[in-house]
Amino acid sequence: MQKVTFPNKILPYFLLAPQIVLTVVFFFWPASQAIYQSFMREDAFGLKSTFVELANFTAVLSDPNYLHSVQVTVVFNVLTALLAMGVALLLATAADRVIRGQTFYRTLLIWPYAVAPAVAGMLWLFIFNPAMGTFAYLLRRNGIAWDPLLDGNQAMGLVVVAAAWKQISYNFLFFVAGLQAIPKSLIEAAAIDGARGARRFWTIVFPLLAPTSFFLLVVNTVYAFFDTFGIIHAVTGGGPAKATETLVYKVYNDGFVNLNLGSSSAQSVILMAIVIALTAFQFRFVEKRVHYS
């Protein structure tokens, strides 16, 4: 491969400058501010601050409400990732077949990804609204007392479905691309040997999708941590009784609603550390089981 050379030595730095500026402004600067404020105790108006060392972290880690948010986040992340990836893989497998109008169907499946999180949340809230929602009416007709604004389990189920629906389109694109990259000769050879559809999928298709699945696992984990804030805020507001208050929503609630800036900053630092550690763990241990050839 021929080495790429630039006629001007300064040009590469100009090309990198926009990305460097964005990274510094929208990541390093906010992260440094959060780390600084996590060691301070400020009043609600930010007029006075006191250095308290690790007091904010100690208070957060000993707070039962924070530990409850950790449990809620784990349940929410696992359910959202499994549902979004499972349904996307099922749809991608169906769309990979040569059928009439497959381009049209694929386009329809991609559209939900363009919907804003808050809009997606309001859409599902309207569908399952206890007073006027279509599905809520059907559930009541079948004897199910549906009210996600009062029942914590129902609220969790609703935000999981809304968050997974939003992410299915993204996963679908990558699974379709992964399926199209699998040589058809392998599947045809297995079919000739007498392997049925389910056996061909689990012994040939699914192992060859391991790189794609691993990548989507990391992406969906980060998505469930951060990008679902708008859905939870629009649908449940963290309720009822903190049943859907995830870590990122508790950061917002304590910082912007309760104006406890020190505690909120400490929580954001802990959340950042959790995501970094979890991602590193996935790349360090899970990736060992992924075969790229």
Curated annotation (Swiss-Prot):
Organism source for this protein?
A: Brucella abortus (strain 2308)
Principal place where this protein is found? membrane
Q: Which UniProt keywords apply?
A: Cell inner membrane, Cell membrane, Membrane, Transmembrane, Transmembrane helix, Transport
Superkingdom assignment: Bacteria
Q: What is this protein called in UniProt?
A: sn-glycerol-3-phosphate transport system permease protein UgpA
What sequence ranges are listed for the domain ABC transmembrane type-1? 66-282
* Oligomer and partners: The complex is composed of two ATP-binding proteins (UgpC), two transmembrane proteins (UgpA and UgpE) and a solute-binding protein (UgpB).
- Output the GO biological process annotations, alphabetical, semicolon-separated: transmembrane transport
> What family does the Swiss-Prot or TrEMBL record give for this protein?
Belongs to the binding-protein-dependent transport system permease family.
One GO cellular component term, please give it.
plasma membrane
Location in the cell = Cell inner membrane
Q: How does it sit in the membrane?
A: Multi-pass membrane protein
